[in-house]
Amino acid sequence: MAVADDTKADLLKVSILGKESIHCGFHLTPYIVQTVLTTLPSSTYVLITDDNIAKLHLNKFEEAFAKGIEKSAANPKPRFLSHVIPPGETSKSREGKARIEDFLLFHKCTRDSVILALGGGVIGDLVGFVAATFMRGVRFCQIPTTLLAMVDSSVGGKTAIDTPHGKNLIGAFWQPEYIFIDAAYLETLPTREFSNGMAEVVKTAAIWDEKEFTSLESRSAELFAAIQTPSTNYAGRTLETRSEAQKLLLSTIAASIGVKAHIVTIDERETGLRNLVNFGHSIGHAIEAVLTPTILHGECVSIGMILEAELSRQLGILTQVGVGRLTRCLKAYNLPTSLSAPLIASLPQASLLTVPRLLDIMRIDKKNSGTNKKIVLLKRIGETYEQKASIVEDKAIEKTLAEAVTVVPSIPTGNVKGSPGEVRMSTPGSKSISNRALVLAALAKGTCRLRNLLHSDDTQGAVFTWEDGGETLVVEGGEGTLTVPTPGKELYLGNAGTAARFLTTVCALAQPAPASVQPPSTNTVITGNARMKQRPIGPLVDALRANGCSIGYRESEGCLPLSIPPNSFKGGKIQLAASVSSQYVSSILLCAPYAQDANGVTLELVGGEVISQPYIDMTIAMMKTFGVEVTRRTDASGKLLDIYDIPRGTYVNPPVYNIESDASSATYPLAVAAITGTKCTIENIGSSSLQGDAKFAVEVLQKMGCEVHQTADETTVQGPPLGQLKAIEEVDMEVMTDAFLTASVLAAVANGGENKAMKITGIANQRVKECNRIRAMMDELAKFGVHTTEQELGLTIYAVPISQLKKNVSVHCYDDHRVAMAFSVLSTVVEGAIIEEKRCVEKTWPGWWDDLENKIGIKVEGVDLAGLRAESSSAGVKESKPIDNSSILLIGMRGTGKTHIGQLAAASLPGWSFVDADHYFESKLKTGVKDFVKNEGWEKFREEELAVLAELIGLGVDGKAVSSPSSYSKNHVISLGGGIVETPAARSLLKAYLAKGGRVVHITRPIDEIVRYLNVETARPAYEEPILDVWKRREPWYKECSGWEFGNVVVEAPQGQAQAANVEAGPGKTKCVKTLAGRNEVKRFFGHLAGINPNFTHGGSVEGQQRRTYFLCLTYPDVRHAFPYIDELTEGADALELRVDLLKDAKAPEAPFPSVAYVKDQVTALRRVTGLPIIYTVRTKAQGGAFPDGNAKEYKELVEAGVRLGVEYLDVEVASIFSDKEVADLSKRTKKAGSTLVIASWHDWSGKMQWDGEDVKRKYDEARKFGDLVKIVGKAEKLEDNFKLLSFVKSATSLPNSPPIIAINMSTLGQSSRILNTTFTPVSHPLLPTKAAPGQLSFKQIQQALHLLGLLPSKHFHLFGTPIAHSMSPTLHNTGFELLGLPFKYGLLESKEVDCKEVRDVISDKEGFGGASVTIPFKVDVIELLDELTESAKEIGAVNTIIPVHRSSINAQGQEETTRVLVGDNTDWVGIRVCITQRVSEGELRNENTSGLVIGAGGTARAAIYALQDLGVPVIYLFNRTKEKAEDLAKAFVGGADKKWNGQLVVLDKLGGGWGDVGVAPRVIVSTVPASATALPSASTAAIAGQVDKSTNQIVLPADVFAYTSGSAVVVDMAYKPAETPLLKLAKELKEEGNWACVQGLEVLLEQGYIQFEKWTGRRCPKEQVSTRVWEKYGEV
């Protein structure tokens, strides 16, 4: 038997640059080697690949070359060399290129060498560039192993490496001699990688070849099958052995390559035409720069293609048809098409995809011309707008990229020539008719051309082709013959509710798959997105089940996903509840002719009033058009019954079916005309329409005062003058329910008639649409200041004048297209409204925002929500985490203090409230918990308790989402009963909540304290067993049902800390958090957990410069030993590292490591004395720590404890005790929770690690896979080791999305690396017992060294004002500078006016001026010298702090430049605020019975009012010696801080007495007048107490100014000379009540000074020592 020649192969060859050098086939290794050896003679052949590819394919090449060289007649015989490099983008660098070149030089390769690049795009780009430059150019061949490389990077001769400035910025055009496409390699490719490559295949077809694109649209399943079916015995190498799937795959690849090859041949050097292959790449590359390496190139390009196609649509170049086809095609290959795709949205990096960030990245693009961005614009499928990239303005790109929009209020400009403001347009095809037409055409006999089909998320084709550039859909009907999909293939419908309901019955018609299909298919599964899984489908399923179709629910009862058996639609008599959705009725009607019963179907609608009858009539009318007539029965009197007879039969397709424009969509442009007083005509919708919503103009708009003219196929509306719409007293919209949202926004401003209220009825079904639309409209209209009330069948809207609508509202759209479009109508008359989730309109009118601007003529702008939500911090030291407003649950034993902790937590979270589940239970069931248990028993109580829990968190008792979650599921802290974990059902529900991203916190307290408390507590049912037994049973349940723990314990604060707000624990009391420190820890913990005030501090900038960060290593066996010195120890530190492995419990001195319980106590104790972030480290002995390497179980328990305690940073060792999967799971969990960041660390104590070696690169690559930060520690044996470290850091940080890196060398020689490290440098302190590592320095030492190196230049700071000779500010700031080792100096600059030469000279020193304080009398005058003000300074109208900020920007030439801006701020109000909240909690201050008093009306009074408004004090009294000034000041502060305060600002005639009309004595008093302006009452002035003594112009202070006695209260006197002012003296004299805390002016000065210090330096001021010195100095003065 002859042996087949394995070097022979049947190929598809593609020509490029006049040469057939691209060879495509299967199993080509022998052919490649033979071709190279025979046609490219050489002395040396070098194959370069990476570790991953080498394992799969290198051995075969080595064998083939050995065999080929042995047969070679060459003399001497050539050499074959191979070189394997690390995989990944890190190798594609200057250093990586140099290493390959060194290999070639070492092996004495010469110019005749031939290099083979075997691998993906990285290998091809890198090796190609090496070939282009080695010996000034050698021959090379591309052998791509990924589909992406086959169709893209290997073709065209582009070679390049990356640099820190961007990807592919250094390279050359260097054409390979051959490109060998071996499609068999794709069999080893993961499916996701195949999809990655298909993005480029779709791209080439989209820009060049519509025929190929059409093939791609319809044949995705076959292409996937080709790579998922392994070819045995080299099948495919020859035509005889090549399967049809292989032929399709190869022709698809060759066709894509052919497009690019043709373009390259015409434009090799990318002067114009070659730009076209960058379609999708301009935006795609920007996305990739943020998301790499998590998201693949093709996935980013896929999103980029859609966004660039939408950009073309926005510019009026591409129709929605093209966008829709492109979207569906990409989705067919499992590619994401939007930034909200789950693959993208689930990533932590997704929050970085801000519009400014993407636009900034897009600046660096080789297609650009100067500052002009160039993008390839699609004209239609298969053709581009220009034969090159087109210039596009940033504004247009911003609008496309933004996730939200704002409509600029204006009168429409219109699109009718000669008639300004008049609009004539058509809307997209009706969704309702499109969906029905698709089903009818697919089930019918023959061919049907559907025109004006809606191209949207909600319409999908069956068997189809496109005509007229996609304007016409050609459907080949199947006569009812359908087959169950292949196993594992589900029908995913997104949020397409209509499609889901129609297809439920359609799937019951499907026939089982042929026996030849193995494994056999059984049922059809239809599913959708999360929202789709909430929408009801139960009544339809019930009807089909009753008819014999055994449909199964795969998740929640009554919702998708469904499992539908084949051939199960029996027919005959069917009863259906139609009071929820008419779509259930239409689903059965459409399929009825194909039911099995010979007599067809008799459909009877039961269960109350039928909803949306017009849609049922529409279905029947369309069925008649397709050849089947439905009969609706009548009774003897001729009254129509809800019974329908449908005969068996076969639909017959009409040749052409024109789909009406969507009447629901038509309501929006018509409503724009109505609300703006303009004219609009909608074509293709009139009185003959099948759609009920076509009546909207006549039945609603005309009655609201519009002129309406309607023909059979056109509707014209002329609105009344602006503001003259009239409310209809009551309108029944049952025949046009979807249009009620449009009517609602018009009703909101229908203020033109006598009636101001408009009642809309007949819309009950709108509660179960994409969202509860009635509730949605009520909630969102409320944001505009519009009052509504809800009824069973609808709602009533109470109109307000347009001028009174609230501005700058952010509208949440609930992923509902109709909500978004309705509020876009209202936004045409109200400023600043932001429509979130702009893309939800894609369901029915994808181009709405473009049409609103281009056709109607109202400007629409993009809004970057991520940018709006970003925290603004002038110091820039906070890292953001996403804000999550889902409610936080508290669980734990009764008596742990859940209620108290919950109340404090809710009070500390802006906009949050507290709810006690037991109280909610009692209010709902109208009985106390104790009585309920007594009467009904524990089992019944647990059932009701579970129902309450489900209701509060917005889930069903089965853990599934519900359609209308309660308001308690957001922005609430919910305390649950101690026994909530007793039942499996409740535990499952809590775990389901956790799994969905909810927060459940276990509140703990020492069990002995709990026992003491419960032994005397009688309010709730007694336990029926010992408390300790209950605790032991529940403890593991609490742990499994919670994600975090919070310890409610009393920790004695160090000496000097304020012991405010003491609440002693004792019988009947559980408030253990009794100190200010305890309150602060509650605020920190829950603020961090919710993402409202994240406690991360590892990055940022100060004055536009990179801010270095440091952490102090605590090396105590018991951290409580550090508490007396904690303020000094933490000077300069941004975080504390808790070395868990070094902890030693004195009660277990022999234990090799601490217990979990001891560690929890240590963390809890540490939290009470410092709010600094904790770096939680369990260092193993292998990496220089104390934890035994063999105790894996205990190590994992300690790490888990850190996560549960919510530590901000968790140090996890690379190559540690954790397996790769465990590390990945841990990383995934922490990223999902968002409260803990992982520091992936590696410590080499051996000194063998070289910073320029391969080992450190591999460790770094491993660490960056799961670490939010990377820490690598080596050992310096010589000074040069530090230089190598810096080089490594520079290279590592140049990679896209490289995490922050901590890189240091141990030993004394390594100290320079600690000085130069920028992120989280570990520091020690002289007061610590030991250093954590050799070579550690203190923070102060590092600052001094940085100054000597010129990296921390000297700065000068000043105080502007007069008189200022005795100011305490120099002492305050200079003490802080000295303690931290900062080379700064603070001095006085006294002048008669602030705008003088001396001041101008100081502030104009751009290098040396660090900032300034401003005091009287210059706080207002100084504003003229500044560039901008902070919001608080603007509101207060005074500046006490000047901050120089350095900002980078791009100039007109595209160059980066830095400018200095002088920013004016006000820290007085912050100082006042801090002093108040140290004495009275924020929750108490917001209590409705709380009031505050401000004495004075000057600049400081403004700061005091601002502070009280910011705290939410509901009533603020203002008293001044000159009442007119107080009244002027009150007018300036209407609306309060940031215009969000809605309390009362009351100007008093006198202090005390009845406190005006309000009658509430103040709990907070702030005096801003000099001490000399007040006086204690005397015998002669007692009669005028509370008023101004005109003889002295002093305020006589009445005793009842301190009348408040119901709780803690505070008086702040801003004057600090004398120390004891008359106001403070009076407070002390009356202090027998014990509730008034006194604050001297110097304390406020200190607090505001601490804030100044941090804003200038980015460092926390060392408060305790600074305070001590200032008070000493004050005493001297």
From Swiss-Prot:
GO terms for biological process: amino acid biosynthetic process; aromatic amino acid family biosynthetic process; chorismate biosynthetic process. The active site is at E270 (proton acceptor), H285 (proton acceptor), C840 (for epsp synthase activity), H1243 (proton acceptor), K1271 (schiff-base intermediate with substrate). Pathway: Metabolic intermediate biosynthesis; chorismate biosynthesis; chorismate from D-erythrose 4-phosphate and phosphoenolpyruvate: step 2/7; Metabolic intermediate biosynthesis; chorismate biosynthesis; chorismate from D-erythrose 4-phosphate and phosphoenolpyruvate: step 3/7; Metabolic intermediate biosynthesis; chorismate biosynthesis; chorismate from D-erythrose 4-phosphate and phosphoenolpyruvate: step 4/7; Metabolic intermediate biosynthesis; chorismate biosynthesis; chorismate from D-erythrose 4-phosphate and phosphoenolpyruvate: step 5/7. Zn(2+) binds at E200, H281, H297. ATP binds at G892, M893, R894, G895, T896, G897, K898, T899. It is found in: Cytoplasm. Pfam families: DHQ_synthase, DHQS_C, DHquinase_I, EPSP_synthase, SDH_C, Shikimate_dh_N, SKI. Residues 885-1113 are annotated as: Shikimate kinase. Residues 1-394 are annotated as: 3-dehydroquinate synthase. Residues 1354-1677 are annotated as: Shikimate dehydrogenase. Its cofactor is Zn(2+). InterPro entries: Aldolase_TIM, Aminoacid_DH-like_N_sf, DHQ_synth_AroB, DHQS/DOIS_N, DHQS_C, DHquinase_I, Enolpyruvate_Tfrase_dom, Enolpyruvate_Tfrase_sf. Residues 1114-1341 are annotated as: 3-dehydroquinase. One of its GO terms (molecular function) is 3-dehydroquinate dehydratase activity. GO terms for cellular component: cytoplasm. NAD(+) binds at residues 50-52, 89-92, 120-122, 125, 145-146, 167, 185-188, 196. Keywords: Amino-acid biosynthesis, Aromatic amino acid biosynthesis, ATP-binding, Cytoplasm, Kinase, Lyase, Metal-binding, Multifunctional enzyme, NADP, Nucleotide-binding, Oxidoreductase, Transferase, Zinc. 7-phospho-2-dehydro-3-deoxy-D-arabino-heptonate binds at residues 136, 152, 158, 168, 200-203, 260, 274-278, 281, 297, 366. Its EC number is 4.2.3.4, 2.5.1.19, 2.7.1.71, 4.2.1.10. In the N-terminal section; belongs to the sugar phosphate cyclases superfamily. Dehydroquinate synthase family. In the 2nd section; belongs to the EPSP synthase family. The AROM polypeptide catalyzes 5 consecutive enzymatic reactions in prechorismate polyaromatic amino acid biosynthesis. Homodimer. This is Pentafunctional AROM polypeptide.
